Curated annotation (Swiss-Prot):
<dbReference type="InterPro" id="IPR036422">
    <property type="entry name" value="RuBisCO_lsu_N_sf"/>
</dbReference>
<keyword id="KW-0488">Methylation</keyword>
<feature type="modified residue" description="N6-carboxylysine">
    <location>
        <position position="192"/>
    </location>
</feature>
<feature type="binding site" description="in homodimeric partner">
    <location>
        <position position="114"/>
    </location>
    <ligand>
        <name>substrate</name>
    </ligand>
</feature>
<keyword id="KW-0460">Magnesium</keyword>
<dbReference type="GO" id="GO:0019253">
    <property type="term" value="P:reductive pentose-phosphate cycle"/>
</dbReference>
<dbReference type="GO" id="GO:0016984">
    <property type="term" value="F:ribulose-bisphosphate carboxylase activity"/>
</dbReference>
<comment type="similarity">
    <text>Belongs to the RuBisCO large chain family. Type I subfamily.</text>
</comment>
<dbReference type="GO" id="GO:0000287">
    <property type="term" value="F:magnesium ion binding"/>
</dbReference>
<keyword id="KW-0113">Calvin cycle</keyword>
<dbReference type="InterPro" id="IPR017443">
    <property type="entry name" value="RuBisCO_lsu_fd_N"/>
</dbReference>
<keyword id="KW-0456">Lyase</keyword>
<dbReference type="InterPro" id="IPR036376">
    <property type="entry name" value="RuBisCO_lsu_C_sf"/>
</dbReference>
<dbReference type="InterPro" id="IPR020878">
    <property type="entry name" value="RuBisCo_large_chain_AS"/>
</dbReference>
<dbReference type="GO" id="GO:0004497">
    <property type="term" value="F:monooxygenase activity"/>
</dbReference>
<comment type="subunit">
    <text>Heterohexadecamer of 8 large chains and 8 small chains; disulfide-linked. The disulfide link is formed within the large subunit homodimers.</text>
</comment>
<comment type="function">
    <text>RuBisCO catalyzes two reactions: the carboxylation of D-ribulose 1,5-bisphosphate, the primary event in carbon dioxide fixation, as well as the oxidative fragmentation of the pentose substrate in the photorespiration process. Both reactions occur simultaneously and in competition at the same active site.</text>
</comment>
């Protein structure tokens, strides 16, 4: 018979290759696969490899016109998930030829574009990706990175402080600018547009940019420190987004902001390129991430979105807090914080890292801890996130009983006290509360903040636990 045999054949015959070893240039993926009852794991794993690379549901004549073995994804290892019935980690290797250079959009379209609706699987979650050096080098990555940001801001040896301006919707541009000024004047490094502040009827973007720039320069003149406000450039079209970034550059502000998941990777990469060319820092908000990453058995883990952002480009990204109101289990959070900041990260399953990742010369991204945190959390945050981080207190600044500026003062005093205590060799984890109490003796603003928030805790079990 001729080589071509029509009909449906099992995926595992072609796409399950337990003997093969992955190449250094392959993109590797770890999927948590939950097959439908009766579907063997080898078939499910091979189905994922096939549907996310060269396969389709039946043998096609045109397969003969190419070398499938050269271009197909292959499932090279399967292991059961400990403690879960009928769940497996399937490791898939994709040849580099399958992907367009420098395109996160294409990488995701290939790897997660189609296969998640596949009928033979009850659920599917992409847990981790290993991006090979050969592919990493096709991306610009973050516009500036951690060291360049510190040099631009002239701030060293401590975490940076931020604050999201609230109420997030409804303020006029002038009142918004006033809140920005008060926070920066009180001692914060950054203030932030909320992710859904774009250009609404009650406050158009240009007015907001102007009033925020004015607030920034006034606070800079009075404090002698460089200040920033994350001007949200996210818009309905790429052209409009770039127009807003251009205006921010003309105002001479240091940083703009983008919602990278709702805005999309193509828009984000364009903005990152613009930011590097024009000396703007880029703050990234992860709005919509929980739609993708919150379910334990389906979707995509945040560490994958994290790696994608480092390729696409951003200087800051929100990372959960470990201690506030939004999720983040400590070891897992620290695992992906390292993936953001370090050049080389070893495989470590206890922190959810499935592959060793080498970022070579791609700049790092600063993790932003934000959501339900206040002065009492400061020692823990300083201890967990270290110096290369932004600690963002929205309500924890603006909720101060005396107003915004005293709220900012309280946070800055608490931070400086924690950094000093750490540098003196004290144990922040154990002595944290004592350090804050001591500092509040000579800062009435901090004392008032300690009064208001002494009892608040958001105690729920984290959804994202290690198996």
């Amino acid at each position: 018979s001729v080589g071509f045999k029509a009909g449906v054949k099992e995926y595992k015959l072609t796409y399950y290759t337990p003997x093969x070893x992955a190449k250094d240039t392959d993109i590797l993926a770890a999927f948590x696969v939950t097959p439908q009852p009766g579907v063997p794991p080898e078939e499910a794993g091979x189905x994922v490899a096939a549907e996310s690379s060269t396969g389709t549901w039946t043998t096609v004549w045109t397969d003969g016109l190419t070398s499938l073995d050269r271009x197909k994804g292959x499932c090279y290892h399967i292991e059961p998930v400990i403690g879960e019935k009928d769940q497996y980690i399937c490791y898939v290797a994709y040849p580099l030829d399958l992907f367009e250079e420098g395109s996160v959009t294409n990488m995701f379209t290939s790897i997660v574009g189609n296969v998640f609706g596949f009928k033979a699987l009850r659920a599917l979650r992409l847990e981790d990706l290993r991006i090979p050096v050969a592919y990493v080098k096709t991306f610009q990555g973050p516009p500036h990175g951690i060291q360049v940001e510190r040099d631009k801001l002239n701030k060293y040896g401590r975490p940076l402080l931020g604050c999201t301006i609230k109420p997030k919707l409804g303020l006029s541009a002038k009142n918004y600018g006033r809140a920005v000024y008060e926070c920066l004047r009180g001692g914060l490094d950054f203030t932030k547009d909320d992710e859904n502040v774009n250009s609404q009827p009650f406050m158009r973007w240009r007015d907001r940019f102007l009033f925020c720039a004015e607030a920034l320069y006034k606070a800079q003149a009075e404090t002698g420190e460089i200040k920033g406000h994350y001007l949200n450039a996210t818009a309905g079209t790429c052209e409009e987004m770039i127009k807003r970034a251009v205006f921010a550059r003309e105002l001479g502000v240091p940083i703009v902001m983008h919602d990278y998941l709702t805005g999309g990777f193509t828009a984000n990469t364009s903005l990152a390129h613009y930011c590097r060319d024009n000396g703007l820092l880029l703050h990234i908000h992860r709005a919509m991430h929980a739609v993708i990453d919150r379910q334990k058995n389906h979707g995509m883990h945040f560490r994958v979105l994290r790696k994608a952002l480092r390729l696409s480009g951003g200087d800051h990204i929100h990372s959960g807090t470990v201690v506030g109101k939004l999720e983040g289990e400590r070891e897992i959070t620290l695992g992906f914080v390292d993936l953001l900041r370090d050049d080389f990260i070893e495989k470590d399953r206890s922190r959810g890292i499935y592959f060793t990742q080498d970022w070579v010369s791609l700049p790092g991204v600063i993790p932003v801890a934000s959501g339900g945190i206040h002065v009492w959390h400061m020692p823990a945050l300083t201890e967990i996130f270290g110096d290369d981080s932004v600690l963002q207190f929205g309500g924890g600044t603006l909720g101060h009983p005396w107003g915004n500026a005293p709220g900012a003062v309280a946070n800055r005093v608490a931070l400086e006290a924690c950094v000093q205590a750490r540098n003196e060799g004290r144990d922040l984890a154990r002595e944290g509360n004592a350090i804050i109490r001591e500092a509040s003796k000579w800062s009435p603003e901090l004392a008032a903040a300690c009064e208001v928030w002494k009892e608040i805790k958001f105690e729920f079990a984290a959804m994202d636990t290690l198996d």
